[in-house]
Amino acid sequence: MRASGILMPVFSLPGPFGIGTLGAEAFAFVDFLARARQTYWQILPIGPTGYGDSPYQSFSAFAGNPYFIDYRVLAEDGWLTPDEVPAPVPVGTVDYGALYNERPVILKRAADRLLAEPSKAYTDFCAAQDFWLDDYALFMALKAEQGQAGLADWPDALRTREPSALAAAHVRLADAVDYHKAVQFFFFTQWSALKTYANQKGIQLVGDIPIYVSPDSSDLWTRPELFQTDGQVHLTQVAGCPPDAFAADGQLWGNPLYDWPRHEAEHFAWWKRRMKHATSIYDVVRIDHFRGFESYYSIPAGNTTAAGGKWVKGPDRAFIDAMHEALGQGGIIAEDLGYLTPEVKTMLAASGYPGMKIMQFAFDSREPGNYLPYTYTRNSVVYTGTHDNVTTEGWRATASPEDVHYACRYLRCTPKDLTEAMIAACLSCVSDMAIIPMADWLHLGAEARINTPSTQGSNWQWRLTTPLTSLLADHIADLTVLYDRTPAAE
């Protein structure tokens, strides 16, 4: 079925609290998508973020980001009084430092009210999520007690989960543990309401999960034996990407690598649980760095660049078979960008999952792969660019003149019309699904870039300040109809 959608991170939504939330503006964006006759809203990972603010480095593979909780909804639900809701602030880029200082104070007031007389909805939530919630809450409480130190720097007894140390921490930090559980209840209550509304409007939520967990995460702390660690929960090998035309030293991500033989011995139980959780909160799930299941780039822990790494065989078809057994064969998007060997292509074909196509890459002379539209298959998802790309207007301004000229020749347009032509090329191509970043529909420049890989500083901060008008929605709808991507219900 041909369909289309828009890529828009939750944090990029407008709103009065310094970051996009799950409140009124999220519901208004669903309305905009429905008027534009879209089928999908693709977001970025929604887990709690830490140093660097990357949603791909979260404290948990299961938890939700407290920054996305909407204060107005908490007040409507009786967990805050109206005068406890902060005064609106102008919509600008996300200031994570301000959120870090303000959010816990206000959320604690709401949590205290909930915990004074826990509701059945809260106790039911805790029971349903017990496979991750208790460990996550204790991890966050301990992290605060340790001055926000990373897991690697915790005292040995806590890092290695000595039973007596954990028992004492549960008693000592009981209030903090309950606070973090309450905050997760608030998040998932609001998330559920948004998803229900979106689905009623015919909009499906496309979630995004990183293949790897963070080195500073409750996931690593809780099950270190599932990762390549020594006996003291220190990493022995870390994840990354080898050098290429875009990064001379490669990319040193620093994430824990999985101990795949251990996962396979457990019939991939942890991954099955992770994916079942993801499919319960999203309608479609994009798995980042999908090729890492066939083989992964392994870098010795402590290396300062990725140049000294090597490729190591992953679980390959055994993992795919386990996911098919647990989830069936639909509802997954495989991010298959980058270095693809014949073995990776064989694994992707066996999975049945659609891969990704990036229209910008088609005209980038540094890109060794062929991303021209004539190479696409129906079972794929096409983007002008993703969160890791500059906007198409930004690409036009920064790409080599030769690349821009080639794109304009191929798409039969002038440079001024390149963004609209690239969008049309995506919508008109054979790929079953087309996803266009919101910033491209608005023809925004490099100031709207979400992330520049291998950099720190101004990433994950862009927010929408341009009004989403009915005129724009109707323009999107017109092209959606023209290229036969209207929702199935129509």
Give the positions of each predicted feature:
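Domain-scale activation on soluble regions of proteins
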Residues: 35, 158-159, 165, 462, ...
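Short alpha-helical segments and helix-capping/turn motifs at coil-helix boundaries
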Residues: 24-31, 189-197, 271-273, 418-422
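Surface-exposed amphipathic alpha-helices with a cationic face
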Residues: 34, 191-199, 324, 348-349
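Outer-envelope exported proteins of Gram-negative bacteria
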Residues: 44, 204-206, 210, 284, ...
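Conserved, well-ordered alpha-helix/loop/beta-strand core segments that scaffold catalytic motifs
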Residues: 180-213
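Catalytic domains of carbohydrate-active enzymes, especially glycoside hydrolases
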Residues: 24-49, 277-282
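Alpha-amylase-like alpha-glycosidases and glucanotransferases acting on alpha-linked glucans and related
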Residues: 9, 53-184, 188, 213-435, ...
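Mature N-terminal, pre-catalytic/accessory segment of carbohydrate-active enzymes
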Residues: 1-37
